[in-house]
Amino acid sequence: MTRPLTAEQVARAFHDACLAELDALKPGNVHRFGVDDVGMSVADFETSARVAAPALAAPGHSVGARIRRSVEATIDAVGHNTNLGIVLLSAPLASAALDDAAGDLRGRLAKVLAGLSVGDARETYAAIRYAKPGGLGEARAHDVGGEPDVTLLEAMEAAEGRDRIAWNYTHDFTDIFDLGLKRFKQAMAESNSRPSAATSVYLSFLASIPDTLIARKFGMAQALEVQQEAKAVEARLDNRANEQARNRDLMAFDQSLKARGLNPGTSADLTVATLFAASLQALEIGC
């Protein structure tokens, strides 16, 4: 077992996870298989991964500081929000990976989440204001436009009904460990291809959970409709088929979503976090 991991290992794992997600054909989202037609480019995401990684993995920082510094580095580099959701999910994982306490990654992560402070909330609110994410709106409780007087975990509890990233904070990243990582391992066994496995993870999230970015922007009915469409695509997906045949159905779904302006961004964020967690687990056991 090779832990605790170094800051360099964690930064590299995060950077690689971000790039691997771009290599996956993710219908409706940014990827290398088509034109940059969701308002952001692959190059923006590559730059974001490069500049955010050192801040996310810096030793000795709180979760909130990791979030704020990573988001500020990103906005300063590319001029707009590309990775707020990714950073929100990845910062606690980075803290857990750098923690020298006993236990596995999931157990240490639970302790990190339970220990989130008011200071973490203040740093995170500042990051969200800096990023100016789309579809956020105003919340009746603990709105990010003001200064929080609750811990970050308490703020996430208030948001969990409308935001799946917040839900994962309050449920110890259940989506990542019980859905994402299980599907990733299964898909890797089927295809031995990380991009194909990442596509499978993304589709599993989209088919299993209404995407909350779509829900915030277009309503829950639209998110549920996309979820049903994703279920049909996932049912037809064959990781053992040749790439051309496999991608034909995925590209048709991709074009349909983009023609309607529907970007399942939360599903993509969960996919990056899954790839990051998989790499951290592999590093910890020396694989």
Predicted regions: what they are:
Residues 1-61, 97-255, 259, 281-287:
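Phosphate-rich cofactor/ligand-interacting catalytic cores and adjacent structured alpha/beta frameworks
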Residues 69, 88-92, 197-204, 271-272:
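Amphipathic alpha-helical interaction segments
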Residues 78-92, 260-276:
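Conserved phosphate/anionic-ligand binding catalytic regions in large, soluble enzymes, centered on
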Residues 54-103:
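Long, hydrophobic/aromatic-enriched structural stretches that serve as scaffold segments
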